[in-house]
Amino acid sequence: KIKSGWERLTSESEYACPAIDKFCEDHCAAKKAVGKCDDFKCNCIKL
């Protein structure tokens, strides 16, 4: 049960911005993009 909550949190990584940039980076890395926090949203920038 904890795992599903954690996956939900990491999949909604913008909620971690700007507190935890790593969530945003990891979330975007899975999409082969670079994650940057923009206020409270996580933006994935394609390379």
From Swiss-Prot:
Cystine pairings recorded for this chain: C17-C37, C24-C42, C28-C44
Record's keyword terms, sorted: Disulfide bond, Ion channel impairing toxin, Membrane, Neurotoxin, Potassium channel impairing toxin, Secreted, Target cell membrane, Target membrane, Toxin
UniProt subcellular location: Secreted; Target cell membrane
Occurrences of domain BetaSPN-type CS-alpha/beta (ranges): 14-47
Record's keyword annotation contains Lyase: no
GO molecular function (one): toxin activity
Keyword Cell membrane: no
GO (cellular component) term, any one: other organism cell membrane
Distribution of this protein across tissues and organs: Expressed by the venom gland.
Additional information: Negative results: has no effect on voltage-gated potassium channel Kv7.1/KCNQ1 and Shaker channels (tested at 10 uM).
Domain remark text: Contains 2 domains: a N-terminal domain that is unstructured or forms an alpha-helix in presence of membranes and a CS-alpha/beta C-terminal domain, which consists of an alpha-helix disulfide-linked to antiparallel beta-sheets.
Biological role: Blocks voltage-gated potassium channels. Its application (10 uM) to cells recombinantly expressing channels results in membrane damage and cell lysis.
Similarity annotation: Belongs to the long chain scorpion toxin family. Class 2 subfamily.
Protein name per the record: Potassium channel toxin TcoKIK
